């Protein structure tokens, strides 16, 4: 009995703290015809039944007594309407009264199915479609406040700012505010700082009235280094062995977007000279990044970011000095901290008292002296390293942070880099490479340190018996292609792992003058391809050779080359001298899309973001089997749902989603956007996206909602699929699983339809190739696998295909 009263008392106290309220969402609208059997109306509250005095139900303001198809359950908190008909429509209300006479009430509107607009049933009561409550924008930009609602027309709208009425074409701010009574959006152009405030829209129709409040924050355009803050600078974290630790760090970021890095300082003894030096390691630490509500933004603006770094199952090697670093090209800020064992807690934070712990102090004085010397030395080394990094950043005028920007699982291999003259820095870099490591995809080769005679590079990699082969098992045939740092050969392989006998393969290797970053990319690509696994629609890893002085990657060979060239060679151009090797049908084109969608669905299930889905990165194998290439450098997102690109380089602009273009945020949903562009390429037989549109105009057009028109010979279903992939809000785009279902249905419809009766594709104008804009470490994409030949064809884009990130930002400012 006493325990029961304790429970009631606790529940009563919780109600007193949080207030009497319903446990389900508030008022909502129901339509007859949605369910053929019954409807449940829920008025459950956060209060024990013993403390509820009564519950009153009404129908159209009349108390519900005994009705044949209406029953109450759970002490009257739920109402069930069974086999309801049109006379059951109307407004239902419930009022819950507690023992202390406090009460709450809510309403439910059941609308008859006969209230329609055309042939489509509509909601009569008003409901806001977009519930965004915070908008952040930069001065001089344009801002649209969206109050679009669902409900019966006509809908009247009233706008209020800071309790002051805004009239249509108002002179509140020199006619910068504009809206139409029939257009439920308020537009503000040429934003000023005084445009910030609380905006309220009030919507009303004959069925009721609702309001929606939005907070608008306006910031000046800032170019500054990021600011790192935490609860306590130079904080010390005390933990025991086996415990987990989370280190929270807060960053205020301005333009350009910052890069994040966690560094660990430790001592390392040279096996040759027995000399001990301080070393700096970039940590593969798992983390979670959150953009705080205060800093959410629509364009380029100030951002308030929280990063939680996770140290799991603390061991001896985790204790020591750490420094978090956030920076951009304008500078950097750091947050140093220590992780120590709890046995040092009293002696470090609270100096020992002479009377009570003098004995303990004497016993540990020697140990503490050693620790003090080590810690002091580490801090001195850390300061020196920070100075060196700062000096390099100043000289190069570019951020050189090698941002992990993803989560890591466990180091598999260690690359020890000995870059020659260590006296200049006094630091040996040790970089861990793991199965989920994915390094830079885009880079400028001129900014990388080349490995030459003065910079010897020692590489130690443990062989993996499941993949390792000897060079004697490979016999190269001819050069398929090469880029700035790598080559790909066609070869004959014997007795590869899990495959006996002889087969034709592609072998990738680095050039002699490759740089440090290329080597890291190469190793990480191997590990990613190992960890992802095999699928029929991706380019699969077959073997690796790493123990005979050089690194080689052996992958499947696709003799038809990349999909873009394959489609161009087989497009139905009506010319006398045209030679078409294969007649492409509508069934084939749909099958190509379906195969790529299946491959991408597999990569998405492995939490991998490709970031460059395009026809040039899809290879065509035997039987016209589609294989997605260049996913070895895709980003792994096992612990978070997005990846923010933080390095400079050339970008495939025309294939990038809006959020990737303007915020450099990549998700599986941004891959969906790129897949829509790929589908457009396939339907147009390798056409160039956004034909005739200059890149400097493309950004503005995309922000205004422009999408490519339906191309020639494209079905309605396929074009609808493309438009769904190009929706501005990422969450509104379909998943790859949904795309597979749609494409399988289209494939059935196209099983007997060919392109015989379709109009021919006009030849494109000759494209002038520029310097390689996309020379990534993976050379297995684009034109390296040539059809029936081994001619050299260096990777390159047309001028329209790629832009640097600086170009994107400048274009964004020009149209903002």
Swiss-Prot record:
User: Could you name the active-site residues?
Assistant: 612
Pinpoint the Ig-like C2-type domain residues.
25-105, 126-217
In this chain, where does the modification Phosphotyrosine occur?
643
SMART domains, per the entry = IG (SM00409), IGc2 (SM00408), TyrKc (SM00219)
GO MF annotation list: ATP binding; fibroblast growth factor receptor activity
The residues the entry assigns to the signal sequence are 1-19
Check the record and name the Pfam families matching this protein. I-set (PF07679), PK_Tyr_Ser-Thr (PF07714)
Q: What is its main location?
A: membrane
Q: What are the binding positions for ATP in this chain?
A: 480-488, 508
Carbohydrate-modified residues are 21, 69, 119, 156, 171, 244, 274, 313, 321
Disulfide bonds, which pairs? 43-94, 147-201
Gene Ontology BP annotations: positive regulation of cell population proliferation
Where is the protein situated, by its record's location annotation?
Membrane
Q: Which parts of the chain span the membrane according to its record?
A: 371-391
Please provide, in alphabetical order, the Gene Ontology terms of the cellular component aspect for this entry.
plasma membrane; receptor complex
Q: What is its EC number?
A: 2.7.10.1
User: What is the membrane topology noted in the UniProt record heading this document?
Assistant: Single-pass membrane protein
Extracellular topology ranges:
20-370
* Protein family according to the UniProt entry: Belongs to the protein kinase superfamily. Tyr protein kinase family. Fibroblast growth factor receptor subfamily.
Under what name is this protein listed? Fibroblast growth factor receptor
Its source organism is: Hydra vulgaris
């Amino acid at each position: 009995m006493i325990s029961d009263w304790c429970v009631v008392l606790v529940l009563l106290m919780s109600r007193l703290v949080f207030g009497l309220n319903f446990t389900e969402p508030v008022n909502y609208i129901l339509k007859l015809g949605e369910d053929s059997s019954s409807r449940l109306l829920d008025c459950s509250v956060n209060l024990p039944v013993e403390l509820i005095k009564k519950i009153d139900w009404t129908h159209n303001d009349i108390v519900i007594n005994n009705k044949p198809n209406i029953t109450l359950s759970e002490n009257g908190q739920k109402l069930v309407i069974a086999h309801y008909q049109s006379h059951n429509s109307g407004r239902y209300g419930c009022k819950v009264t507690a023992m202390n006479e406090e009460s709450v009430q809510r309403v439910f509107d059941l609308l008859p199915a006969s209230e329609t607009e055309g042939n489509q049933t509509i909601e009569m009561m008003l409901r806001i479609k977009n519930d965004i409550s915070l908008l952040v924008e930069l001065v001089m930009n344009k801002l649209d406040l969206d109050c679009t609602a669902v409900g019966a027309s006509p809908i009247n709208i009233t706008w209020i700012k800071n309790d002051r009425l805004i009239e249509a074409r108002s002179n509140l701010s020199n006619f910068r505010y504009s809206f139409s009574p029939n257009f439920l959006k308020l537009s503000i152009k040429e934003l000023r700082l005084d445009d910030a405030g609380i905006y309220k829209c009030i919507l009303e129709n004959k069925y009721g009235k609702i309001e929606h409040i939005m907070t608008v924050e306006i910031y000046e355009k800032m170019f500054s280094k990021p600011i790192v803050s935490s609860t306590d600078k130079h904080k010390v974290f005390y933990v025991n062995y086996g415990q987990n630790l989370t280190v929270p760090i807060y960053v205020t970021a301005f333009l350009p977007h910052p890069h994040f890095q966690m560094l660990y300082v430790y001592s390392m003894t040279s096996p040759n000279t027995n000399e001990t030096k301080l070393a700096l390691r970039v940590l593969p630490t798992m983390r979670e990044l959150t953009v705080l509500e205060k800093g959410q933004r629509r364009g380029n603006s100030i951002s308030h970011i929280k990063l939680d770094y996770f140290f799991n199952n603390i061991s001896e090697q985790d204790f020591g000095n750490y420094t978090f670093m956030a920076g951009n090209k304008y500078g950097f800020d750091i947050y140093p901290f220590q992780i120590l064992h709890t046995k040092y807690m009293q002696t470090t934070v609270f100096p020992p008292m002479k009377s009570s712990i003098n004995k303990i102090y004497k016993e540990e004085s020697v140990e503490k002296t050693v620790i003090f010397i080590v810690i002091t030395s580490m801090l001195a080394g850390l300061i020196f390293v920070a100075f060196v990094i700062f000096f390099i950043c100043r000289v190069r005028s570019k951020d050189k942070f090698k941002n992990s920007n993803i989560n890591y699982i466990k180091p598999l291999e260690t690359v020890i880099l000995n870059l020659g003259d260590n006296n200049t820095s006094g630091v040996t870099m040790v970089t861990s490479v793991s199965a989920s490591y994915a390094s830079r995809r885009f880079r400028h080769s001129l900014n990388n340190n080349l490995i030459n005679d003065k910079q010897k590079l020692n590489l130690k990699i443990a062989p993996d018996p499941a993949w390792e082969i000897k060079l004697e098992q490979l016999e190269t045939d001819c050069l398929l292609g090469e880029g700035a740092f790598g080559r790909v050969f066609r070869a004959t392989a014997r007795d590869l792992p899990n495959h006996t006998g002889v087969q034709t393969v592609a072998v990738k290797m680095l050039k002699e003058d490759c740089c440090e970053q290329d080597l890291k990319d190469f190793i990480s690509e191997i590990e990613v391809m190992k960890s992802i696994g095999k699928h029929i629609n991706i380019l699969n890893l077959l073997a690796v050779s790493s123990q005979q002085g050089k690194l080689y990657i052996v992958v499947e060979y696709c003799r038809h080359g990349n999909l873009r060239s394959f489609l161009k060679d087989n497009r139905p151009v009506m010319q006398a001298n045209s030679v078409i090797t294969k007649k492409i049908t509508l069934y084939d084109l749909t099958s190509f899309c379906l195969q790529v969608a299946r491959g991408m669905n597999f990569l998405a299930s492995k939490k991998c973001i490709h970031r460059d889905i395009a026809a040039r990165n899809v290879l065509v194998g035997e039987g016209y089997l589609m294989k997605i290439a260049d996913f070895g450098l895709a980003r792994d997102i096992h612990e978070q749902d997005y990846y923010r690109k933080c390095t400079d380089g050339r970008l495939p602009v025309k294939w990038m989603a809006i959020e990737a273009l303007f915020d450099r945020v990549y998700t599986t949903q941004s891959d969906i956007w790129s897949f829509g562009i790929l589908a457009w390429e396939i339907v147009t037989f390798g056409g160039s996206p956004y034909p005739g549109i200059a890149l400097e105009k493309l950004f503005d057009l995309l922000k205004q909602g422009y999408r490519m028109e339906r191309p020639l010979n494209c079905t309605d279903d396929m074009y609808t699929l493309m438009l769904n992939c190009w929706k501005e809000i990422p969450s509104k785009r379909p998943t790859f699983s949904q795309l597979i279902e749609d494409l399988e249905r289209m494939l059935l419809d196209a099983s007997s339809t060919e392109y015989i009766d379709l109009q021919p594709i006009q030849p494109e104008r000759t494209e002038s190739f520029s310097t390689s804009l996309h020379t990534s470490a993976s050379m297995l994409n684009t034109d390296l696998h040539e059809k029936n030949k081994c001619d050299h064809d260096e990777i390159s884009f047309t001028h329209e295909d790629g832009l640097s990130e600086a170009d994107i930002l400048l274009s964004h400012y020009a149209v903002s």
